[in-house]
Design a protein with these regions (language model features):
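N-terminal nucleotide-binding beta1-loop-alpha1 segment
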Residues: 1-18
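Conserved N-terminal catalytic core of the sugar/cofactor nucleotidyltransferase
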Residues: 2-4, 30-116, 407
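Short beta-strand/turn micro-motifs composed of small residues
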Residues: 9, 52, 100, 127-128
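Short glycine-enriched, charge-decorated loop/helix-capping segments at active-site entrances
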Residues: 20-26, 71, 185-188
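Conserved core of the sugar-phosphate nucleotidyltransferase
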Residues: 57, 61, 65, 106-190, ...
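Conserved alpha/beta core of the MobA/IspD/sugar-nucleotide pyrophosphorylase nucleotidyltransferase superfamily
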Residues: 164-265
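Glycine-rich hexapeptide-repeat left-handed beta-helix
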Residues: 304-453
């Protein structure tokens, strides 16, 4: 039997107290609407249909062609929202699966089970046993134990308030029955049309079936910032369990934050208070953290990043950074680079084996293989109007507190004395020092004490 999926996402989200539409709020780095679409895709049925209202343009743009859309201009209830999609869906499938976009944590196997259930009646729904059922409509059963209807919390009788089985707002309808019965749903005293009325209709027309869902984390509904935080914590636990099962170590998983788009290699250890954000890729056998943020960056095998922030940067294999390093957009550290404490690199490439021990800034620079950047070195790359490049050759030795005033080139094997202000190019193998820096002799001359900075 063929299937289509419908996601209800037209709510105002006023309790979120945010200018951002509710469906655009992120969970572990991904907007809620994309999580809902991915859940629908996993259930089958091709491109889902979203019923949207507030923030419709932003939701459409975020979906990027992965869904079809209908609008619900007035919020007249969930049955009215489904009716808005009839023109798109009628005649396209035998079954219609419906769920709420603000309950985006359904596991693929749960929705597939709902979609594939073979029921005698026209409706199958998901239910759960809630410790606190006040947020949900209660599932009312008849004397034989069959589903008889759903009663919202405000309308419960004293006897019904003891019911703990709740309606989870996810349904699979026989399509022809759905479109026929929607027209028969009567308005509530508030003038709204509720999808839950169809449960009672189905109970009198072949029966409504219920599938229990035990994992309460799947059915977290998001209406407030507190709900959003609860859902994010649940999704984070799910993500971390997956990486632990894949051979990634976490000293304290409760303090590790890995985005849905991040990847981590086997054997890597992630220490407490570490964030892997966006499309970050970490290789095998690394140690990341503690207190580290990797944002949209690539980290090769066997790297060590400690107490540092790495943004839009690339680290090849066997690189060490930190503690307290900051790699900014365009930083590229080749194999075996060491960047010590309190260093910053922006839009610069450091060649294989280069060392930048501490307290240095490299911006808009190219550093050759094996070069040594002494403590306190700064590339003075901005003249007040535009940025300029600095080039440091392979094997160069930059003395402590050197100021390299760009644009400038320091040649291969060249050296600068401590405290030098380099305003002109330094040829290969030469030593310069002073303010401004002047040539003294070839860097290899015997009177120069190698190793001093």
């Amino acid at each position: 039997m063929t299937l289509r999926t419908l996601i209800l996402a037209a709510g105002l989200g006023t309790r979120m107290k945010s200018v951002l539409p509710k469906m655009m709020h992120p969970l572990c780095g991904r907007p809620m609407v994309l999580l809902a679409i991915e859940a629908a895709e996993a259930a089958g049925g091709g491109k889902p249909v979203l019923v949207v209202g507030h923030g419709a343009d932003a939701v459409r743009e975020c979906a990027n062609g992965r869904a079809e859309f209908v609008e619900q201009p007035e919020l007249l209830g969930t049955a009215d929202a489904v009716r808005r999609a009839e023109g798109l869906l009628r005649g396209t499938a035998d079954k219609v699966l419906v769920f709420y976009g603000d309950m985006p944590l359904w596991k693929p196997e749960t929705l597939r089970r709902l979609a594939e259930e073979r029921a005698a009646g026209p409706l199958v729904m998901l239910t759960g046993i809630a410790a606190d059922a006040r947020m949900f409509g209660r599932v009312i059963r008849d004397a034989a134990g069959n589903v008889a209807g759903v009663v919202e919390n405000a309308h419960l009788t004293a006897e019904q308030k003891s019911v703990r089985e709740v309606n989870l707002g996810a349904y699979c309808f026989r399509a022809d029955w759905l479109w026929e019965m929607l027209a028969k749903v009567k308005p509530s005293p508030k003038g709204e049309y509720y999808l839950t009325d169809l449960v009672e209709m189905a109970a009198h027309d072949g029966g409504a079936s219920a599938i229990p869902v035990d994992d309460e984390e799947e059915w977290i509904g998001i209406n407030t910032r507190a709900h959003l935080a609860e859902a994010e914590a649940a999704l984070r636990r799910r993500i971390n369990r997956r990486w632990l099962e894949a051979g990634v170590g976490m000293q304290d998983p409760s303090t590790v934050y890995v985005s849905l788009d991040a990847t981590v290699g086997e054997g890597t250890m992630i220490l407490p208070n570490t964030h892997l954000e966006g499309k970050t890729a970490v290789g095998r056998d690394c140690v990341i953290g503690p207190n580290t943020v990797l944002r949209r960056s690539a980290v090769g095998d066997r790297c060590r990043v400690e107490c540092s922030v790495v943004e839009d940067a690339t680290l090849e294999e066997d690189v060490s950074v930190g503690p307290f390093g900051h790699l900014r957009r365009g930083a590229y550290l080749e194999r075996g680079v060491h960047m010590g404490n309190f260093g910053e690199v922006k839009n610069s490439r450091l060649g294989a084996g280069a060392k930048m021990g501490h307290f240095s800034y490299l911006g808009d620079a190219a550093v050759g293989a094996g070069a040594n950047i002494g403590a306190g070195t700064i590339t003075c790359n901005y003249d007040g109007q535009q940025k300029h490049r600095t080039e440091i050759g392979a094997g160069a030795f930059i003395g402590s507190d050197s100021m390299l005033v760009a644009p400038v080139k320091v040649g291969k094997g060249a050296r600068t004395g401590a405290g030098s202000v380099v305003t002109h190019d330094v040829p290969d193998g030469e030593l310069v020092l002073g303010v401004p820096a002047r040539k003294i002799r070839k860097a290899g001359a015997k009177s120069v004490k190698r190793g001093r900075r």
